[in-house]
Every structure is written in C-alpha cells, then in structure tokens.
C-alpha cells in the first residue's frame, strides 16, 4: 500500500480485518515525515471548523475519537495528524516512513516497488500494489503567457504557509475553490492589495440551496473520466461554494468579488485582455492538483487521453494495480467505501495466485 492518508489507511484497515497481517502479508509505505497524509502539510490557519468535512476512518470509534466532535478551533493539520497517529498505533498498521516510492515495475510475474528511505534505497517484490498516493505531491499551475518571466513569487496551495509572508504585498489569488477563498479571507488586512481571479463565475449557495444533484453529477463525471482514462474534472466547479457567515462578510467587504482570468503575466504584475494591469508581488495559485502517478510510469498504464483507466478500483490494463482515493473516491467518505471494496478484491486476487 503506497500512501498512509485517508485512502491508504482505510484499505489497510480492511485488509487487516480480512485476515492479512500488517508488516508481513502487506506493508504500508508513506513518504511523509509524520502521520496525517496530506493534512500534515496544510497551512496553520486552516482550522477543523473551516476545512472540508472530514469523515472518520473505519473503526475510529474503537479508539474513542471522531472528527465530528473535534475542537473546531484547532489547526486541521494537528488534529488529523494526532487522530491518524492513534489510529495507526491502535490497529498496529506498522506504517513505514519516511519512504518515497520511486518506481513500480514488472519482473517476470512479480511487481517490484523501488523506494528510497532514510536507511538507503531498496525494493519490495509483491503480488499486488494499492496506489493511495493522492494528489498533494503533484500541484498544478496552468500556463499563461509570461509565467516564467514573473519577477515576484509563484506560490501554490501546497507551498502556502501563512499570511505573514505576504504582509504589505500586492497579491493575486487564482482559483475558484475553498482554498482560494480561505487564502483571501486570511490575507485580507495583511496584504497591501488583494485581487481574486477565477476562470469561471463563482456560485455562492446558501446552506439550503446546496445542489446535491450537481454534486452527484460531479462525482459521476469523475468516475466516467477515471474509467475512460481522461484527466479528472474539478468537483468544486460542479457543486458551488457554501455561503457561510464568514464568506458573506467577505463578499460584503468586497474581498470575495472575483474578476475574470487575466490574459498574461508580466514581470511586475498581470494584465487582462482589455489592457487593465494589476501590479503583483506574488501570485497564489489555488489551481488544484493532479494525481501523483509518476512512479507507475514503467507499467505503461496511461491512456493517450492522459489518464489511467480505472474501474471498480483497479487498472483496466493491469488488474494487480489498485487505486485508492482516485477520482470519485477522493473524498473521505468515498475513500472509506472504496477501501472496503478494494481490500476485498485484493484478498480475492491473492487467493487465486
């Protein structure tokens, strides 16, 4: 199992429940220095109360903790890291970290997982690989004319630490999701000037108006893309943004009023097609991530459309490669459901070898 975030831990829990022994029948490798998956890298100001709803991992009730009752004022990265640490210890999942998987390749009928660890490089010969690497390690910044000539700072969501580093600066925030909105609200009053740009209009919805049908359609679109091997579409673009009191206050102040996307980047700012120019010391790219799949390149699983065809949790091209937390499974509740399904399929496959 490559990755010990929500998807990897969920699969590992069910593998153990189905009779496999952690550390001998299966191993979990994780690149992070500590527990928490991608959450351990989130910015300090992101609180449990303002983060996307985090569903409990399967069996978490056995250790007496729940994200539903966690202190909403605490940093999300700290709470998740703590709960996941307790989870790993309680279920004795024996996660090996920090271990970075460099490649997965074929050797006869076996799969070989090559890795780097603090003790040196090595390899594991295995029958099955569950890829649960998520997306955090593969940030996406779209190309615009002048991108590489910008004299200021390019900062992606993955690199953002706190508003303090932008004190008194002219900042452009790019993106239409909750991360972009969170940065804007945090930077308001700290940055000298804030400009929000997005590729598409932002739909703010009251709590009772949240479009569940659109959300279901967005997840279905992710599933269809995964099955066809296409690039995975955005979920947020199909579901809208909840209009909380904090967000409404930001709208009323004029902080959360997006402009259309600029057409080019210049050394000292950004320019729109109509000639309007905005000086910028930094551009924060809240433009999402792509699945982290580089280590699987030797297996030649990619389709010409750019993605990997995945159905019912496994690769169409190689049924020994499973994908947890991929496409429609990316949410915490989706990862839990998929974890059970993938674990059952893995055990069934192993029993036939």
Language-model-detected regions and their locations in the chain:
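Redox-cofactor-proximal catalytic regions of oxidoreductases
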Residues: 34-63
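Short, basic/glycine-rich phosphate-binding loops at helix/coil junctions
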Residues: 56-66, 225-230
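Flavin (primarily FAD) cofactor-binding/catalytic cores of flavoenzymes
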Residues: 1-33, 37-40, 44-45, 69-353
